């Protein structure tokens, strides 16, 4: 549920996302850790394609590798805040159809259901994450600043009567466009989006899927997606645990996988989950799993009150010129161990429109204040419609 606590936290927060999607130089692999297959490298891009530096951030390399009981391999990375996360790779020859329940759990995949119809839905969800591009040679970059969170009507953004594209209401924002599902609580949000084609000027943005909560200072926004970098049409996949309640304790800035790259037109698949005090982040590009991170949450942390599907303008930058961004196969799960999901279109959704001044204006793009707005809702997705840069 959206409350005034949410807006207060947002107004009080001075934290902004800087230009955190920077290409990072390909680095030396850990000697004892396996490299991804050639096919995976071709699918996701190579380090040279995003080669430069982890500018303004901290370059992270794997410090250890551990074989888990069911056969997956966990590569450990230490974060500057003193915590660590693991990026988990499937075993060689992994087949999600025949894998044990224990292995599916290690890999952050939902339980295999019974019944033909349920199996068809389940296979469509897990198939994009079944081919591994993960290895100990992957380099991550934690940027120096965390992200803001999307604003809702309670933040005083000039919401009026319900817009045609938002069954649960709407607001304007200077930084976000997309929908927020408000039929939670949720433990899992999944879906795909098409990586947009953007210009090469000094502008950047990102598209992501996440879970959020507004329960005071314990609130957490857990999100994963892909950026559109300055100077390039695509960008690096990333994950982040952001303290949406206002306290920065135990949270991190965006952590980008600089060994992978999402090109314009690529299908980016996201699976964001939490269970107890553990957050899970999966990102796949064209069916190759590149991020399968497991990150601890501080005691008392709360998330899953809403599910967010957003395009975000990098603070301080003009929004790049862009193609429209199609979100598809969007589903949520009410329980971590459940194999029952609910499609996007059957839930209450709240629309957020990106504008020049943060106020809401009725679409379409003929209104010069509108930068990007969500519409074209189907049972399983929608489109973020680009209008103009600003």
Regions picked out by a protein language model, each given a short descriptive name:
Residues 2-41:
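Secretory targeting and sorting signals
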Residues 41-390:
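Exposed, interaction-prone regions of secreted/extracellular proteins
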């Amino acid at each position: 549920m959206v409350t005034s606590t949410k807006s207060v936290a947002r107004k009080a927060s001075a934290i902004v996302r800087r230009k955190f999607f920077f290409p990072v130089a390909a680095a030396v692999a850990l000697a004892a850790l396996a490299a991804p297959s050639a096919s995976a490298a071709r699918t996701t891009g190579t380090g040279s394609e995003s080669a430069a530096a982890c500018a303004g951030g901290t370059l992270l390399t794997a410090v250890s590798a551990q074989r888990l009981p069911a056969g997956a391999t966990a590569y450990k990375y230490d974060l500057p805040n003193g915590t660590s996360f693991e990026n988990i790779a499937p075993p060689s020859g992994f087949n999600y159809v025949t894998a044990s329940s224990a292995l599916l759990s290690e890999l952050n995949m939902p339980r295999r259901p019974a019944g033909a119809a349920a199996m068809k839905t389940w296979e469509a969800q897990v198939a994009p994450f079944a081919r591994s591009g993960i290895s100990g040679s992957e380099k991550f970059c934690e940027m120096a600043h965390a992200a803001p969170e999307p604003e809702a009507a309670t933040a005083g953004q000039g919401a009026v009567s319900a817009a045609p594209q938002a069954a649960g209401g709407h607001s304007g924002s200077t930084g976000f466009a997309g929908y927020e599902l408000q039929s939670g609580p949720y433990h899992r949000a999944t879906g795909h989006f098409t990586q947009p084609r953007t210009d090469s000027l000094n502008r950047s943005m990102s598209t992501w899927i996440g879970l959020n909560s507004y329960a005071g200072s314990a609130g957490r926004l857990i999100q994963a997606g892909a950026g559109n970098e300055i100077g390039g049409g695509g960008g690096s996949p990333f994950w982040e645990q952001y303290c949406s309640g206002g306290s920065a304790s135990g949270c991190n800035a965006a952590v980008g996988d600089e060994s992978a790259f999402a090109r314009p037109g690529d299908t980016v698949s996201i699976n964001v989950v939490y269970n107890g005090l553990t957050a899970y982040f999966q990102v796949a590009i064209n069916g190759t799993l590149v991020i399968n991170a497991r990150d601890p949450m501080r005691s008392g942390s709360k998330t899953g009150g809403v599910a967010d599907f957003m395009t975000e303008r990098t603070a301080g930058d003009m929004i790049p010129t862009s193609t429209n961004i199609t979100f598809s196969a969007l589903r949520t799960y009410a329980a971590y161990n459940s194999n029952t999901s609910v499609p996007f279109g059957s839930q209450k959704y709240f629309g957020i429109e990106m504008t020049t001044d943060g106020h809401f204006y009725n679409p379409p793009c003929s209104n010069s204040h509108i930068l990007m707005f969500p519409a074209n809702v189907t049972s399983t997705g929608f489109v973020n419609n680009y209008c103009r840069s600003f």
